[in-house]
Every structure is written in structure tokens, then in C-alpha cells.
């Protein structure tokens, strides 16, 4: 099953309405912290935009992501704040809410691919978004300042080429400003407007 045409219509309207992103405020359970390296952040919040392009579809919308070591809350919204997709993971279970329906699976990647048809490397995104690499990644070029310019990530289906198109200072650390992730069947762009390292509040 694929995402309904209504979701893609909302997303395409969003492209026409895109405005500069406003500041994201950490959720009430977390406090912002400063780090010297993004790897030091055990949890973070991101506000930005994501665009997915395949041979069949084009999709672009706002992105909010609360990432923790064992849990995630990822939301796609219109510029007016309407949520069109929510993906949550916790304790080995993934839940996807879209088009008024809820789907569950033990594997978030399989769930998203099965429902949306998008082949997105979810497991690797938290690393790439913060300028880090995984065990399947090979850096092929650097920028003059030492930040990563491009890497290749091995995947059984087809390798991913990840281009870091800009870097910025956020929460005291250097993190990518714009990522382009592509292989022959899909192109993904993620723009980070604000990245905040956070820590759970002491109760």
C-alpha cells in the first residue's frame, strides 16, 4: 500500500507555501545543552525540511525529529502545522500514523517502505544528520576545513551516496546544514534549520 494521493497533494501545496522555519522549543521533558561534538548528544531535536524524489513521486514538507538512544518521534507537517505523517519508535516497536490510519511493525524501515513506498535509510539518518558515519560508510572526500564532503554507504540493494552540502554551528557543535542522499531509485534532501542537543530533565 502507498500513501494516498491526498498526502502528496498536501505536501506539494506545502512546497508552494514554504516559509523560513521558526525556532524549535525543546519538549517539556528535555532541556537544551551545549556540546563540543554532536556525538556527545544522547538526545536531540531537529526542525527542518525533507524532500523525497523517486521516479513516481515527489514529496517535500517540514520535518520535526526528536531522537533518543532507543526512541524516536518523527513528524512531517505542513507550513500551517498540520501533521501529515508521524513515525514513532520505542522499545523495538514502530508506529506509523498517516491518513487517519495507524500501522505497526517491529522494524521502522520496513514499516515506512511498505506503507509509503519510500526507500529511506532510517537507521543511518541520525548519524548523517549529525555528521557522523556508521560501520558501512566510507568517506570519499573532505572539505578544506576537515568536515565531511561526501561518503558512500554500503547497502545490500544499492549503495547510498551521501553529500554534505553545507555545515553550521548548532548547540556548540558542527552539524550538516544540508544533506543530499541518493541512489538510482531515490533522492532525499534534508535541510536542518535548527538542531538542539538536549538532556532529559531530572525529576
Swiss-Prot record:
Keywords: Cell outer membrane, Chaperone, Lipoprotein, Membrane, Palmitate, Protein transport, Signal, Transport. It is found in: Cell outer membrane. InterPro entries: LolA/LolB/LppX, OM_lipoprot_LolB. GO terms for biological process: lipoprotein localization to outer membrane; protein transport. A lipid is attached at residue 22 (N-palmitoyl cysteine). A lipid is attached at residue 22 (S-diacylglycerol cysteine). One of its GO terms (cellular component) is cell outer membrane. Coiled coil: none annotated. Pfam families: LolB. Its main location: membrane. Residues 1-21 form the signal peptide. It is a lipid-anchor. Monomer. Belongs to the LolB family. Plays a critical role in the incorporation of lipoproteins in the outer membrane after they are released by the LolA protein. This is Outer-membrane lipoprotein LolB. It comes from Shewanella frigidimarina (strain NCIMB 400).
Amino acid at each position: 500500500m502507498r500513501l494516498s494521493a491526498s498526502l502528496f497533494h498536501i505536501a506539494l501545496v506545502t512546497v508552494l507555501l514554504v516559509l523560513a522555519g521558526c525556532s524549535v522549543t525543546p519538549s517539556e521533558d528535555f532541556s537544551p545543552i551545549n556540546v563540543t561534538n554532536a556525538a556527545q548528544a544522547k538526545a536531540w531535536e531537529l526542525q527542518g525540511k525533507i524532500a523525497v524524489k523517486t521516479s513516481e513521486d515527489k514529496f517535500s514538507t517540514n520535518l520535526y525529529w526528536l531522537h533518543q538512544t532507543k526512541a524516536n518521534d518523527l513528524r512531517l507537517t505542513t507550513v500551517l502545522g498540520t501533521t501529515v505523517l508521524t513515525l514513532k519508535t520505542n522499545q523495538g516497536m514502530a508506529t506509523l500514523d498517516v491518513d487517519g490510519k495507524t500501522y505497526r511493525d517491529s522494524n521502522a524501515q520496513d514499516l515506512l517502505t511498505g506503507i509509503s513506498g519510500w526507500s529511506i535509510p532510517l537507521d543511518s539518518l541520525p548519524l548523517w544528520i549529525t555528521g557522523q558515519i556508521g560501520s558501512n560508510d566510507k568517506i570519499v572526500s573532505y572539505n578544506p576545513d576537515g568536515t565531511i564532503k561526501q561518503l558512500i554507504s554500503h547497502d545490500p540493494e544499492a549503495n547510498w551516496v551521501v553529500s554534505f552540502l553545507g555545515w553550521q554551528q548548532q548547540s556548540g557543535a558542527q552539524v550538516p546544514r544540508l544533506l543530499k542522499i541518493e541512489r538510482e531509485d531515490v533522492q532525499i534532501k534534508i535541510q536542518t534549520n535548527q538542531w538542539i542537543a538536549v538532556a532529559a530533565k531530572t525529576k
